[in-house]
Swiss-Prot record:
One of its GO terms (cellular component) is cellular bud neck. The chain crosses the membrane at residues 253-273. The gene is KRE6. The modification Phosphoserine is found at S81, S116, S133, S134, S136, S139. Residues 274-720 are lumenal. It is found in: Golgi apparatus membrane. PANTHER family: BETA-GLUCAN SYNTHESIS-ASSOCIATED PROTEIN KRE6-RELATED. It is a single-pass type II membrane protein. This is Beta-glucan synthesis-associated protein KRE6. Glycans are attached at N374, N461, N538, N563, N691. InterPro entries: ConA-like_dom_sf, GH16, Skn1/Kre6/Sbg1. The keyword Glycoprotein applies.
């Protein structure tokens, strides 16, 4: 296809015009000067004479024509040339026949032969618009013409809209010398019948694109959708997708839904069912754990004596502090295998099913954690979730079954875990029968009172504003009014506590220690008894406890170091040791002595609890005392070293024995001078419902006393 020659040199002047390409238009205005081309045929010259610039307005073309009709000394400047862009004062003088550097663009590389000719400002020639559609059209081109690259048609089948190349060729070859030639005018007025490699839309043939809004193509509906129709389809798209869904799409959708439902079942439903245990469909056959193979005859299994037949004869007596022999009045050797202690199972012991909230324990006391194995009672603590708590343990108590009033209580035990590890709370202790351990409503106003005066000591907070006491006052005081609720009016009653052992750890020296204490109320000033009446026998192993009490109890306590072999674990562990108390409750010569093994650790004499401040004498307990054996764990007791507590841990009890003077034997919970049975029976709600925390919650009220109740008592008179 012939293009305008940008490389050949052509000099022209106003006198060197082709006669076939000159003349006036129909208005008489002079036409633009057209240079003659020495190496181009006449047909090509004539074809280009009538062309106009499609990208210039009529005013711009008129100005261009006026500029072309100036003096012949001014050379012709084609529209769009580089020279036209220069300012008038600095525009290049094109009248000088100075050469321009050779063209070195794309076409110079593709047609090197055309570049070899001299450059003589031939770029001033008007653009050449001949179009070639086939090689035959270019047969008359000279070797200096630059050929365009092969035509690329993106849409080879665009229909009749594209002008045929034959028609274009006809327009390109029609003569243009006649001003009235309609064919030439039609061709020159159509800006899109120019060379095919030019397009204002990015380099493709202009004839291949629709340029008018009314032109239509077969794929217009894809590019110009109807908004209303699209909106209607959008509203029904979900329904139509299902309505016109083929089998393959339906099967794919079903597969996706199936995978989604399977994922929900596997990752949500199945874990929930597994966690709740809803799918643990075990057989209906009840599993029974046999604690022992021993067969007990129904009648011979009943013990007829408080002293266990398995107790050796050498243990039938015990020597007291004064050298007298006290006789054995009760014993339990726990030699029978598989004993259980649910309520009603055993005549002497009960394993309660409670949470010990009084000390904010972390375990739940469950009856199934207390049983007899290998000739011992075992209280087992597991990291086993129970009743919303994460630990389960055992407690055994003889409340309202076996009690004693003064005497000696001896217990042989192997303590749990390691002695050097802090956290566990093993306990061997006693408490007055008017309070049941773990049942807070029953203990309110009686624990740990041991008081026989009618003064500030029986009032709430001891009538002291300094916060020494948070107790509600003594419920069963000595001066209870006539007609009030009292087990035996005229006697001060309570539920004091004596601890044979509470296990803890001395973390500085890494050994276990035994806290042995008396818990009483009301309290001394600063919780300090008279230490002139307290004996410590060996200060290398026993010292008075730095903890002397708090607003809920006064604790007269001493701590003694223990051997690491007396614990469950350890290189030499597994040995048993006996712990004991010995006490007499005489007001003048009474005492309490504690033992580790056969060695006494310290003694409190009755005179250590003399009047102090606005309170009177605290007495060594005259109440019938029940026995409690338990293994607990609580942050209120000691730092818990979790990583070294190896659950399950077990406190083993070899035996429990009670000794009393032969002239003062009382192994009952309802002695005549300190009765408890009738009182308990008339207030069973407080003693059987562990969820009740106050006496009022159980439905009862504190009895009035003559000190604060404005009433009288026939059993007690205030001294003047």
């Amino acid at each position: 296809m012939p293009l305008r020659n940008l490389t050949e040199t052509h000099n022209f002047s106003s006198t060197n015009l082709d006669t076939d390409g000159t003349g006036d238009d129909h208005d008489g205005a002079p036409l633009s000067s057209s240079p003659s081309f020495g190496q181009q045929n006449d047909n090509s010259t004539n074809d280009n004479a009538g062309l106009t610039n499609p990208f210039m307005g009529s005013d711009e073309e008129s100005n261009a024509r006026d500029g072309e009709s100036l003096s012949s000394s001014v050379h012709y400047q084609p529209q769009g040339s580089d020279s036209s862009l220069l300012h008038d004062n600095s525009r290049l003088d094109l009248s000088q026949n100075k050469g321009v550097s050779d063209y070195k663009g794309y076409y110079s590389r593709n047609n090197s032969r055309a570049v070899s000719t001299a450059n003589d400002n031939s770029f001033l020639q008007p653009p050449h618009r001949a179009i070639a559609s086939s090689p035959s059209l270019n047969s008359n081109l000279s070797k200096n013409d630059i050929l365009s690259p092969p035509e690329f048609d993106r849409y080879p089948l665009v229909g009749s809209r594209v002008t045929s190349m034959t028609q274009l060729n006809h327009h390109g070859r029609s003569p243009t010398s006649s001003p009235g030639n309609e064919s030439s005018a039609s061709f020159s007025s159509n800006p899109f019948l120019g060379e095919q490699d030019f397009s204002p839309f990015g380099g493709y043939p202009a004839s291949s694109f629709p340029l008018m809004i009314d032109e239509k193509e077969e794929d217009d509906y894809l590019h110009n959708p109807d908004p209303e129709e699209e909106a209607r389809l959008d509203r029904r798209r979900f329904i139509d997708d299902f309505k016109y869904m083929d089998k393959r799409s339906a099967s794919g959708l079903a597969g996706v839904l199936l995978l989604f439902l399977a994922a929900i079942f596997i990752f949500i439903v199945l874990p929930a069912l597994t966690f709740t245990g809803a799918i643990d469909h075990e057989s209906n056959t009840e599993e029974v754990t046999y604690l022992t193979q021993y067969q007990y005859p129904q009648l011979s299994a009943i013990r007829t004596s408080l002293v266990d037949p398995d107790t050796p004869d050498t243990a039938k007596t015990r020597e007291a502090m004064d050298g007298s022999k006290w006789e054995l009045v009760f014993s339990d050797e726990f030699n029978a295998e598989g004993r259980t202690f649910y309520d009603g199972d055993d005549p002497y012991w009960t394993a309660p099913d409670v949470h010990y909230d009084a000390t904010k324990d972390l375990e739940w006391y469950s009856p199934d954690a207390s049983t007899t194995v290998n000739g011992t009672l075992q209280l087992r603590m597991d990291a086993f979730k129970n009743h919303g708590l994460y630990y389960r343990s055992g407690m055994l108590q003889s409340w309202n079954k076996v009690c004693f009033t003064q005497g000696a209580l001896e217990i042989s035990a192997n303590l749990p875990n390691y002695g050097r590890v802090s956290g566990l709370w093993p306990g061997l202790w006693t408490m007055g029968n008017l309070g049941r351990p773990g049942y807070l409503a029953s203990t309110q106003g009686v624990w740990p009172y041991s008081y026989e005066s009618c003064d500030a000591g029986i009032t709430p907070n001891q009538s002291s504003p300094d916060g020494i006491s948070y107790l509600p006052g003594q419920k069963l005081s000595i001066c209870t009014c006539d007609g009030e609720d009292h087990p035996n009016q005229g006697v001060g009653r309570g539920a004091p506590e004596i601890d044979v052992l509470e296990g803890e750890t001395d973390t500085k020296i890494g050994v276990g220690i035994a806290s042995q204490s008396l818990q009483i109320a009301p309290f001394d000033i600063w919780y300090m008894p008279d230490y002139d009446f307290i004996e410590v026998y060996n200060f290398t192993t026993t010292t008075m406890n730095t903890y002397a009490g708090g607003p809920f109890q006064q604790a007269v306590s001493a701590v003694s170091t223990l051997n690491v072999t007396w614990y469950e674990f350890g290189e030499y562990g597994g040995y048993f040791q006996k712990y004991a108390i010995e006490y007499l409750n005489d007001d003048d010569n009474g005492y309490i002595r504690w033992f580790v093994g056969d060695t006494p650790t310290y003694t409190i004499h009755a005179k250590a609890l003399h009047p102090d401040g606005n309170i009177g004498w605290r007495r060594i307990s005259k109440e019938p005392m029940s026995i409690i054996l338990n293994l607990g764990i609580s942050n209120n007791w000691a730092y818990i070293d979790w990583q070294y507590i190896f659950f399950p841990v077990v406190m083993s009890i070899d035996y429990v024995r009670i000794y009393q003077p032969s002239n003062a034997i009382s192994v009952t919970c309802d002695p005549s001078d300190y009765p408890t049975y009738d009182y308990i029976q008339s207030h069973l709600n407080a003693f059987q419902n562990a969820n009740l925390t106050t006496w009022e919650d159980a439905g009862y009220t504190f009895p009035k006393n003559i000190l604060t109740g404005k009433c009288t008592s026939s059993k007690f008179k205030l001294s003047s």
